[in-house]
């Protein structure tokens, strides 16, 4: 049985002091979380050490928001797996639509990050998703297929999470219909060819829609943005029914 992974991506939010206060409020709210799920938070790099000092790793894991494909070198503004592992990080988000958009990350670069994350002992959370224009032109399946085939080449599906995040639903308040999201997640599972791969949905996930999203057969978790910044909202998402 696939374990549910409920992940929060804080993006460029929260200082170390704010992260500490958040954890003090959040951890008691998830202490009785069910054994069939895992909670992961991806704080800014500066707050990762706060997590490693103050979080309880039995039910809360740390993710980075990106990762480089080398352990060291002249790569300004990048961060390596060994730097992250030293602080208790066990997951790494790669291929999020924001680096794809703002820094022109290619599927080839995303693949290098994902492969090296696995080689270093981390579990990559690889994001895929189509734009509104691509969706309206009926190209969603083709775009997702390309991103999966190129971005996941030579990865180990037994140590992998794929997050389907329709770009038009991220931070907009618009949520992909649960059945439509499930159909894309089913496509991703078939493309990977491994039934036990964990597939998340991301895009305006909130307490008022989490139960419907998680009732879908091919959705194994969520990657949450804005709603993960509020400890009560994120706890409700983590404790979905």
Swiss-Prot record:
Name this polypeptide is given: Triosephosphate isomerase
UniProt keyword Nucleotide-binding, yes or no: no
Pathway(s) per entry: Carbohydrate biosynthesis; gluconeogenesis; Carbohydrate degradation; glycolysis; D-glyceraldehyde 3-phosphate from glycerone phosphate: step 1/1
Family to which this protein belongs: Belongs to the triosephosphate isomerase family.
Alphabetized Pfam families for the sequence: TIM
NCBIfam families per UniProt: tim
GO cellular component, one term: cytosol
Source species, domain of life: Bacteria
Molecular function in Gene Ontology: triose-phosphate isomerase activity
Keyword Isomerase annotated: yes
Enzyme Commission numbers on file: 5.3.1.1
Compartments (UniProt record): Cytoplasm
InterPro entries: Aldolase_TIM, TIM_sf, TrioseP_Isoase_bac/euk, Triosephosphate_isomerase, Triosephosphate_isomerase_AS
Annotated substrate binding sites: 9-11, 171, 204, 225-226
Annotated keywords: Cytoplasm, Gluconeogenesis, Glycolysis, Isomerase
Task performed by this protein: Involved in the gluconeogenesis. Catalyzes stereospecifically the conversion of dihydroxyacetone phosphate (DHAP) to D-glyceraldehyde-3-phosphate (G3P).
Reactions this protein catalyses: D-glyceraldehyde 3-phosphate = dihydroxyacetone phosphate
Species the sequence originates in: Prochlorococcus marinus (strain MIT 9312)
Chief localisation class: cytoplasm
Catalytic residues as annotated in Swiss-Prot or TrEMBL: 96 (electrophile), 165 (proton acceptor)
GO biological process, any: glyceraldehyde-3-phosphate biosynthetic process
Quaternary structure annotation from Swiss-Prot or TrEMBL: Homodimer.
């Amino acid at each position: 049985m696939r374990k549910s992974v409920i992940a929060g991506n804080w993006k460029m939010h929260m200082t170390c002091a704010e992260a500490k206060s958040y954890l003090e409020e959040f951890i008691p709210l998830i202490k009785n979380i069910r054994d069939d799920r895992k909670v992961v938070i991806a704080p800014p790099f500066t707050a990762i050490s706060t997590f490693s000092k103050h979080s309880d790793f039995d039910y809360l894991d740390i993710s980075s928001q990106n990762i480089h494909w080398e352990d060291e070198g002249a790569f300004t503004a990048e961060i390596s797996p060994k730097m992250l592992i030293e602080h208790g990080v066990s997951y790494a988000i790669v291929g999020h639509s924001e680096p794809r958009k703002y820094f022109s990350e290619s599927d080839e670069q995303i693949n290098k990050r994902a492969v090296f994350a696995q080689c270093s002992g981390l579990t990559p959370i690889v994001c895929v998703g189509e734009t509104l224009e691509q969706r309206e032109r009926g190209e969603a399946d083709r775009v997702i297929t390309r991103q999966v085939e190129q971005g996941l080449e030579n990865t180990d599906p037994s140590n992998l999470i794929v997050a389907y995040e329709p770009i038009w639903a991220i931070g907009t308040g618009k949520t992909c219909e649960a059945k439509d999201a499930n159909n894309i997640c089913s496509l991703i599972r078939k493309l990977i060819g491994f039934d036990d791969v964990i597939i998340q949905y991301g895009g305006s996930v909130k307490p008022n829609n989490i139960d419907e999203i998680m009732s879908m057969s091919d959705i194994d978790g969520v990657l949450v943005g804005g709603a993960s910044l509020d400890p009560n909202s994120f706890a409700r998402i983590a404790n979905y029914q």
